[in-house]
Amino acid sequence: MRELNELKHLAIIMDGNGRWAQERGKQRVRGHEKGAETIREITMFCSKSDISFLTLYAFSTENWKRPKTEVDFLMRLLSDYLKKEAEVYLKNNIRFKAIGDLSRFSSRLLDEIETLTQKSASCSGLTQVLALNYGSKDEIIRATQKMIEAGVEVSEENLSRFLDTAFAPDVDMLVRTGGDYRLSNYLLWQSSYAELFFTPTLWPDFTAGELAIQIEEFKRRKRRFGGI
């Protein structure tokens, strides 16, 4: 009997917050608030499983194009999330990491990101990663520049060492909520052999129960990694 696949790194594109709110006659920001609650539910579910890394697409390099009022709200929401969740992370042995080009964020937000990163550094359970001002193409360019500056040979192995996610294994399973069928410039290098799952469920409505069903399907799939 074939062994079930091992899921160590789960990545999620959390899509559908705005549409969730609009369908209910609410402002888009209300969808982001509800989406933050879903982050908490999914993170706690993963922390109680064998998953080692959960990487969430929280804010892309393209999201700056949204209305300033929405971007400002997202920054405040992120700040509130980092402060409110700190105790939860530590209590549940969850390590926090952030990836992306963080230089565009305010010094206050950077301090909050660094504070939670340092406080949770010794946690040995799930590592929750927020992709912030993240774009995969941008990440690969930055990694290549670092390789050149370090004077090392440009190779697949070396590039992986200089990516934002150098601390984590490649993605095993990638889920996108919201009904669209695209990767949106997310973890393109790391997801080369990831199993992809797309669901019409909007992120605020996504549950640990639905994720559990997808994980069972993942475990049954045959991962060939280019072989037969």
Swiss-Prot record:
InterPro entries listed in its UniProt record: UPP_synth-like (IPR001441), UPP_synth-like_CS (IPR018520), UPP_synth-like_sf (IPR036424)
Superkingdom as given in the UniProt entry: Bacteria
Record note on cofactor: Binds 2 magnesium ions per subunit.
Keywords carried by this UniProt record: Magnesium, Metal-binding, Transferase
Example of a GO biological process term: polyprenol biosynthetic process
EC number: 2.5.1.-
Cofactor: Mg(2+)
Sites where the protein binds Mg(2+): 15, 195
Binding site for substrate: 16-20, 28, 32, 60-62, 64, 66, 176, 182-184
Catalytic site: 15, 63 (proton acceptor)
Signal peptide positions on this chain: none
Pfam families in the record: Prenyltransf
One term of GO molecular function: magnesium ion binding
GO cellular component term, pick one: cytosol
Task performed by this protein: Catalyzes the condensation of isopentenyl diphosphate (IPP) with allylic pyrophosphates generating different type of terpenoids.
Record NCBIfam families: PRK14833.1, uppS
Assembly, per entry: Homodimer.
Family per record: Belongs to the UPP synthase family.
Name by which UniProt lists this protein: Isoprenyl transferase
Gene: uppS
